[in-house]
Amino acid sequence: DRLAALRPAAPDFALMWDNAYCLHEVYGQFVPFRDMLTLCREAGNADMVYEFASTSKITFPGAGVAVMAASEANLKYLSGLLGAQTISYDKVNQLRHVRFLQDKAHVLELMQRHAAILRPKFEAVLAALRGIAPLGIASWTEPKGGYFVSCDAMPGTAKRTLALCAEAGVTMTP
């Protein structure tokens, strides 16, 4: 609600809403995020937000189908830009996705299969972090969805923490 109600000083301020993990539940059933487009419209900021998502972490990394949502005015503006930049979209890839994903029920079922694969990995990471909890050297999130655990180490330890993770074969996003 706070983001939607922003009153930016700059008239061209834009909220680029990355909704990449909108379907990525690791625990439980699908719970949709609040609709940022509607929240912004209701707050009088319909033209402030551009929302993006894709199927790249659902189907093929780097080869998914991207989507964008915005107000009618912003879509009209962007259509003019994209029309000059893009000759044609990859219609074969779009068709491949439509045939594979089919509908919302099939997408949600696929995401449950993804969650079954990822859940043990999340549990292993969280178990290791819980093991160091008594030391008080870090704090972390325990997400219900998405594909990231955010870990905050003690000040001044980031480089060494990243080096130790790399030695253990764990990839961290600094």
Residue ranges and their predicted role:
Residues 41-119:
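Conserved core segment of the aminotransferase class I/II
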Residues 31-35, 68-69, 166-167:
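Glycine-rich, phosphate-binding/catalytic loops in enzymes
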Residues 75, 79, 150-174:
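Conserved C-terminal alpha-helix-loop-beta "cap" of PLP-dependent enzymes
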Residues 16-19, 53, 67-69, 148-152:
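Short beta-strand segments
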Residues 1-61:
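Active-site pre-lysine segment of PLP-dependent enzymes
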Residues 112-126, 137-152:
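Conserved glycine-rich beta-strand-loop-beta hairpin in the small C-terminal domain of fold type I
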Residues 17, 97, 172-174:
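Hydrophobic residues in well-ordered beta-strands that form the structural core
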